[in-house]
Amino acid sequence: MNLLDFFRERKKKETPAAIAKERLQIIVAHERGQRSEPDYLPALQKELVEVIRKYVNIDSDQVHVALEDQGSCSILELNITLPDR
C-alpha cells in the first residue's frame, strides 16, 4: 500500500456523523409516511381559528379539523361549535 492508497481509503469511509445523519433521515421519512395527517393540518387549523375569531368569539378547542382520504380525492371536514347568540 502506498501513500496515495492510504488517502483514497480514508475518503471512502463514512464518518459516524454521516452514518447517523443518514439513519435519522430514513427514520424521519418512514415516520412521515405512516402519519395519517399531513404536516400542514395543525397550521391550517390555527389559521382557520384566527379567521373565524375575526367574526365570532370562539375557543380553539371548539374547532375540529379532519382530513379524510376517499380514493382519488381528499375531504377536509371542519366542525365548529358556535356560541349561542
Curated annotation (Swiss-Prot):
This is Cell division topological specificity factor. InterPro entries: MinE, MinE_sf. It comes from the Bacteria. Keywords: Cell cycle, Cell division. NCBIfam families: minE, PRK00296.1. The keyword Cell cycle applies. GO terms for biological process: cell division; regulation of division septum assembly. The keyword Membrane does not apply. Pfam families: MinE. Belongs to the MinE family. Gene3D superfamilies: Cell division topological specificity factor MinE (3.30.1070.10). Prevents the cell division inhibition by proteins MinC and MinD at internal division sites while permitting inhibition at polar sites. This ensures cell division at the proper site by restricting the formation of a division septum at the midpoint of the long axis of the cell.
